[in-house]
Amino acid sequence: MFKNFKLNKLLFFAPLITLMFCFNAPQNDEEKMQTIMISVKNTLSYLHYSPKPINDAYSADVYDKYMEMIDPGKRFFLQSEVDEFSKHRTKLDDYLNRGDLTFYKLTVDKLYDRTAEIEKYSQEILSKPINFEENDELILEPKLKKYPQNQEELKNEWKKFIKYNILQEIETLNAKEETQREKKDSVNRLKLKDTIKLEILTPAQKQVKATEEVKDLMTSMFKRFQKRKKMDWFSVYMNAYTEVFDPHTNYFSPQDKEDFDVNFVGKVIGIGATIQESKGKIKIGTLVVGAPAWKSKQISEGDEILKVQSKKGEEPINVTGMLVDEAVRFIRGEKGTEVVLTLKKKDGTIKEVKMIREEVAIEDTFARSIIINGANGKKYGFINLPSFNADFEDAKGRNASDDIKAELIKLKAQNVEGIILDLRNNGGGSLTEVVDIMGLFMNNGPVVQVKDGNGRVQVMRNKQNDPIWTGPLVIMQNELSASASEILAG
């Protein structure tokens, strides 16, 4: 639950507390970062439910957390570099107070330089035959590892890591082959028509295929890194500060906040198509029925997006090689505005498709139900609720309580004997929604108490006197059910 922030009347979502900041247009990235650091410090110090001292002890914890986040596998930095970084171990509190980027720039600049070196190492390693007969030891658990002492140890670490990934790919090929054999055996045993074609590879062929797969994997990994902006790493740095202060407090960049809002509200202004990246190409995934891309009848799954004209009159942007998130931001826009995609179809033809952006619902956000026919001949209603979603900006927008109510009415009309409410993997959402949902199952009464940082207690009550369902009810949870899910389950 939101138990660590004073400003939490609306949102009740355990893992995420949003720190948002606005910037004047003239500021460059470095000035933005400095402003953010000071704003984060002030937010933590003055608005947090239970603020802690920002001192040397806090600084040391932030340092440890950040090092785990920036190089989790201890495969990028040398021990000598970490020794240099550690000189700043008790200074991070001071840097936060005054918006000093010294430590951040030191670590991120070194990370970029080192990644370029490792890319060359990887290409060199993969260009030569790899000996799989020699005995090697690769430690995967970071807590049991030490940083490489020198470049030779670093190179050897990556050689073993690459070899490990090739062996994993070979094991995957073996597993697929075994699955094919089992299916073919079943078909023959049942005397069915055999349409299964076995692809049997020799050990040498598997090694070649696995090596090529890992080459593609490494190439893709380094390309993704090159496309990441330093502001992305700054978000990592800021989250080290916030998560040490409290594990349920997070910093969101404007882009992260936009993505969070889209997933929480369950709607987006766009064309209604999932966008995917494959080997540097941006492609169309599934289409939402009724959305602009589907209605155009000119867009198909697998089409490659070459360019996006985000605004009328502007030059189209070449999106080939972009990160998916970056390409998506050109496709999204304001409702009622035009977007033009230049597509390469599967047959090689190039086509321009003009569409007007619309509001598109993300159905995976909302409650859904099915009827389960029991072995005893009775029917049971099963409702899955992914999150306690709500649209705080649109009073007519969809919310979890209205969706659950509609599903209950539908299931009740089917004369189900009981309801199973699935809250597995539901991390929470709107506190108001959980109170309203409680009213669908019970008469009015207190549901939850909220205590702010000044000790004031607010009792939130269910005011409904006409529950929709009073029959048998089972609520399913798992370790990822949190916050509002825990309140509803009682």
Q: Where does each model-flagged region fall?
A:
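Cleft-lining beta-strand/loop regions that shape enzyme active-site pockets
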Residues: 23-28, 45-55, 223-230, 246-268, ...
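N-terminal mature-domain "stem" immediately C-terminal to a signal peptide or N-terminal signal-anchor/transmembrane
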Residues: 28-71
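PDZ/PDZ-like domain segments forming the peptide/carboxylate-binding groove
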Residues: 52, 68-69, 90, 104, ...
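Bacterial Sec-dependent signal peptides at the C-terminal "C-region" and cleavage site
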Residues: 5-9, 18-31
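Extended, small/polar residue-biased N-terminal targeting/export presequences
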Residues: 54-60, 67-142, 222-277, 338-340, ...
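Extracytoplasmic/secreted proteins, especially bacterial periplasmic and envelope-associated proteins
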Residues: 35, 39, 57, 61, ...
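Acidic/histidine-rich, surface-exposed loop or edge segments in extracytoplasmic proteins
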Residues: 37-49, 67, 87-91, 216-220, ...
